[in-house]
């Protein structure tokens, strides 16, 4: 993290404004000022030095209600995600932001997107979503989670990945216990303990289902169990345990890769109308113990292009980037 975020956290914990003043003083104006003017001056800069700074700008904005700094953080996110990232949700070559109009180095370097970058971009994405509940943030969160973060741990030995090369037919290097303690090992340990943090969201009487991951949630007196084989299964089911009947709304995210018109929603096996609003399909009722609500998530094969418009493509099925073998 960045020092500005640390001091902002201390200010929040202690209630002392002098720490918030320090947080602003430790905010790097060379990066912040162009963002305030919606200018992208990131080319050539060390990527994971800048992302924690912006997390700090957002943290300060949240504590002080600073709309300008909040907007700067959003502009940075939009710039990196829409103009400087590839299909797996990662960014940077050899740890640095390359020219946004030229991704050729991304396709040839053995040092492609850095895991730490995506770790911190997911932290920023979480903060932005918590402010606005815009499903666009969750679409990008899901893409990076499944295609970059999930793939950065060795499923046998448990090593972690520093770089994910985008070179066709290339390989990745995993950390070794006695010889490798890169930055991406430290953040990597956190990555794989955080899969549950953005599955659900809530307001007073609304439960948001943002990610389709098998999980159990205790929401007040309501127990929610999500049952799914996603992404191998194109559906998810919620099983509710309420004790006493309770009225609330369940809102499922409509992913960018799915077609709301083809979705099917059932409650206890009975079809329900499917109407998407604000990026969510909602079902409101008085829920009873043992109720089940199931949503189908039709997937299709599609092509993802690079932001520079070059003739290079990734094939995706649903949210997942496909690989050949």
Describe each PLM feature range.
Residues 1-325:
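Glycan-recognition and catalytic cores of secretory/periplasmic carbohydrate-active enzymes
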């Amino acid at each position: 993290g960045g020092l500005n975020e640390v001091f902002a956290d201390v200010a929040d914990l202690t209630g002392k404004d002098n720490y918030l003043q320090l947080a602003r003083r430790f905010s790097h104006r060379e990066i912040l000022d162009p963002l305030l003017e919606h200018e992208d001056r990131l080319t050539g800069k060390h990527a994971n030095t800048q992302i924690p700074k912006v997390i700090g700008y957002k943290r300060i904005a949240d504590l002080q209600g600073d709309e300008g700094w909040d907007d700067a953080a959003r502009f940075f996110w939009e710039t990196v995600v829409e103009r400087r990232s590839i299909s797996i949700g990662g960014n940077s070559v050899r740890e640095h932001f390359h020219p946004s109009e030229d991704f050729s180095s991304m396709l040839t370097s053995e040092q492609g997107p850095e895991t730490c970058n995506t770790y911190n971009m997911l932290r920023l994405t979480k903060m932005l979503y918590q402010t606005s509940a815009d499903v666009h943030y969750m679409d990008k969160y899901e893409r990076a989670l499944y295609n970059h973060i999930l793939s950065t741990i060795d499923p046998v030995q448990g090593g972690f990945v520093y770089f994910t090369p985008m070179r066709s037919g290339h390989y990745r290097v995993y950390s070794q216990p006695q010889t490798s303690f890169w930055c991406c090992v430290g953040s990597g340990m956190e990555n794989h303990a955080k899969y549950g943090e953005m599955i659900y969201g809530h307001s007073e009487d609304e439960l948001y289902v943002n990610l389709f991951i098998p999980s159990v949630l205790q929401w007040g007196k309501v127990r929610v169990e999500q049952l799914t084989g996603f992404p191998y299964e194109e559906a998810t089911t919620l099983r509710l345990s309420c004790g006493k009947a309770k009225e609330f709304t369940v809102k499922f995210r409509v992913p960018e890769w799915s077609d709301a018109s083809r979705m099917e929603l059932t409650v206890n096996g009975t079809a329900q109308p499917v109407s998407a609003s604000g990026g969510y399909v909602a079902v409101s009722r008085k829920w009873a113990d043992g109720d089940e609500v199931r949503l189908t998530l039709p997937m299709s094969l599609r092509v993802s292009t690079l932001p520079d418009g070059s003739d290079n493509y990734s094939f995706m099925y649903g949210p997942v980037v496909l690989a050949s073998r």
